[in-house]
C-alpha cells in the first residue's frame, strides 16, 4: 500500500499489555478519544458519572515501530476495542494503522510471527465531544509505593464489608480502613502498612491525612494490577487521590478520584 496513504503506523510486541489495558479501561470508560501523536498515545477522559479522571500516556519510544508525524484524535468505544484485542496472546504483536482513504476506520492487526498467523480488523470510529484535562504537577504530602496485587486484595476484601475505603496517615504509618461511620456494615477492617516489602512510604512533611473514597471505583482501578507490579498512591489533604500504574514498559496510567465529603 502507498505509504502516503498511511497516516500512522504503530506496532508493539506487548500485545498482552495492550489487551490488559483496555480490559481495565472498559470498567471505567465507555467512549473515549484516543490521541495518536508524534510523542505517543494519550487518553485524558472523565468517566460517565464524572467522578474519576483517567490519564494515559504511552511513549512513542517504547513501541517497536512508531510512525506518526501529526496528531490524530480518534473516537472509539472502549468495550468494542477490547472485544477485538481479546484474542491477543502473550507472544502476539498489535499494529494500529490509520489510512487517509478510510478516515472513518482504524485498522488493527494482531500477528503471531512464530505461528505465521495474522488477524486484521477494521473498527468504526465514533464522534466524541472531548476536552483534554491535564493532571497538574502537585507536591503531595505522602507517596506510597506498594505491590499492585496487595492493594487490589485490600480493596477487594474491604468491598465485602463496606462501600468506602478510608485512608489514614499518622506519622510514618498509613492504614486502610473500612468506613467506621457506616452503621449498616456488619464488621470493620483495618490494614496498617509501614516501610517493608509490602509498602514504601515517602512523607514530604508531617501532615496527617484522612479521606474516604468509593470502593466501587477503586476496585475497578485495581484491574490495572494485571499489567503493573506496583502501584503508586499519592495523598494530599483536600486534594483528589491519584493512583499510578505502569503499562508494561510502555508508559503510565493514572486514575484520579475526589474524596467523598462526609
Swiss-Prot record:
Source organism, top-level taxon: Viruses
Alphabetical list of InterPro entries matching this protein: DNA_clamp_sf, Pr_cel_nuc_antig, Pr_cel_nuc_antig_C, Pr_cel_nuc_antig_CS, Pr_cel_nuc_antig_N
Protein keywords: DNA replication, DNA-binding
Any Gene Ontology biological process: regulation of DNA replication
Sample GO molecular function, one term: DNA polymerase processivity factor activity
Pfam family, one: PCNA_C
Keyword Zinc-finger: no
DNA-binding region per UniProt: 67-86
CDD domains hit by this protein: PCNA
SUPFAM superfamilies named among the record's database cross-references: DNA clamp
PANTHER family: PROLIFERATING CELL NUCLEAR ANTIGEN (PTHR11352:SF0)
Entry's family note: Belongs to the PCNA family.
Function: Sliding clamp subunit. Responsible for tethering the catalytic subunit of DNA polymerase to DNA during high-speed replication.
Protein name according to UniProt: Probable DNA polymerase sliding clamp 1
Provenance organism: Paramecium bursaria Chlorella virus 1 (PBCV-1)
